[in-house]
Amino acid sequence: MQVQVSPAWKSIRIRGLLIMNKSQLPTLQDIEELTAFLPRLYAEGFSPIESWSGGEKLKDGSFSLPYPTYNPVVEEFFRLVSSKGWLDYEYDPEQAYQMLKDEDLVKTASLSQIKTMLTFCVRGERFSDGHWGQMIEEGYIRRVLERLDEIKWERRKDHS
C-alpha cells in the first residue's frame, strides 16, 4: 500500500484517495468545482434516481432489497465530494443530520460544518439505499451548495 503524508500532517494519500483532517479546509477551486453542480442537480425536470431495481421475491421465498440507479450527475457529485477532501472522518451522524435540518444554521455554516454535513450526505447511502436521492430531493444538498456559493463569492471578494 502506498501512503504519502504531507509535511504538515494535514493530509494523507492512501491508494490514491486524499484524506484530510478536520483542520484542512477545501480551497476556492474545490468550492467552485462543487458549486458547479447546483444548476445541474436542480435543473428543471432533473431526477436524481433514474430507476429502482430489486425488491422482488427470490426462489427461496425471501425478497431482495430495492436499490436505486442514480443519474450519472449524482454519482459524479458524490464521487467528487468523497475524493476531494470534503469528508469529516470524525463526524457524528446524528449531529450532522440535526445541522442539515436547521436551515438557519446551514445559511451561516462554516466550511468545517459543511464538511460534516456533506459527510452525512455521502455516508448515508451506505446504510440506506436512496439516501443520496433523498438528500437532493428534499433540498439539503441545494442549501449546502447555496451556502458554499456564498462562501465562494466572499473568498473571491477577499482575494481581489
Language model feature labels by segment:
Residues 46-53, 105-108, 123-135:
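Charged, low-complexity interaction regions
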Residues 116-159:
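Amphipathic alpha-helical binding modules
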Residues 90-93:
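Low-complexity, small/polar and acidic-rich linker and loop segments
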Residues 6-19:
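Short, Lys/Arg-enriched N-terminal segments with co-localized hydrophobic residues
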Residues 2-4:
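Low-complexity, intrinsically disordered or signal/transmembrane-proximal segments
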Residues 51-62, 111-127:
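Amphipathic, non-membrane alpha-helical rod segments
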Residues 21-87:
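Short terminal alpha-helical segments
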